[in-house]
């Protein structure tokens, strides 16, 4: 974390680099915002506020690691049908594979610092290998693309790219450039892991599946069930309190409705669809902050997490590594896929940037729409 302290009298600034583990805790974020408002409005002293912040940092998380593993698996199961076109069988397989990835992230990575450095690559290798193995079972109706993307949806660097795009748009060039570059390399790691896992199974079983698209077997009306369920589970996974869930679910579902119908009319414009949905999400979140005095950023984040898998699914860019794996295993065989640039995993990173740039533009436009002159009494706690 890079913190800059400016001095208006001398026109100088001091930059401090704070080393801390990256994470998101929506309930503690709400508590910190409440302390901030009390200090700004002189209902609480600075020393007492500092003591409360230390107490908030020392408090344990609302949900233990084993519950986070179950929530991760449930998130993977819920995102598979509405974002990646999986059916009920793929939903069950995604839950099982989500358990494996969640165990690697919340249990093994927390115990081993060395493994945490290679978690993303190892998880993508395991998921792509197992997903292609399940998809190659004859007459199983298991879709390799759906179960693989659903299991990896929660470790996509969408939040990192979004923060980088927002910082670049607000002229924070150093922090934004660092985040964007890190997210691109992170995307390449995921693409390499998918390629390696798919190629390993292709070497072992020459009749491995090459299908990445799935027939839509579940009625679109079930999205009214899957999207709220995914929103609730990913909010709890990010340590949200139950009292925060109603507004999160409402904003998330409204944003997804905009994404769904905008995607019908702008099928080849992922960033424009993301910008429209982000604008609606930002307007609702900022109105929640302005009228009901809530915390906009915590109410909007789960809705943004819903948008990222939808944008990735529109181009199947996460599975661009499958074509590379087929090229490695079957050097003389030509296989056609639906990806826009299947020979390179860079297409995945570019799709992530397109989606997140669209989201950042929509969020800035929504803040300008609700707060055209900014907030005078306190800071704007929004995205």
Curated annotation (Swiss-Prot):
Keywords: Membrane, Transmembrane, Transmembrane helix
Topological domain spans for side Extracellular: 87, 139-141, 202-216, 263-271, 315-352
Keyword Transmembrane helix: yes
Protein's cellular compartments: Membrane
Cellular component terms per the entry's GO annotation: endoplasmic reticulum; membrane
GO molecular function, one term: transmembrane transporter activity
Cytoplasmic compartment residues: 1-65, 109-117, 163-180, 238-241, 293, 374-383
Membrane disposition: Multi-pass membrane protein
InterPro entries: ThrE-like_N, ThrE/Ser_Exporter, ThrE_2
Predominant location: membrane
Record field: transmembrane: 66-86, 88-108, 118-138, 142-162, 181-201, 217-237, 242-262, 272-292, 294-314, 353-373
Family: Belongs to the ThrE exporter (TC 2.A.79) family.
Protein name in the entry: Pheromone-regulated membrane protein 10
The species this protein was found in: Saccharomyces cerevisiae (strain ATCC 204508 / S288c)
Lineage of producing organism: Eukaryota, Fungi, Dikarya, Ascomycota, Saccharomycotina
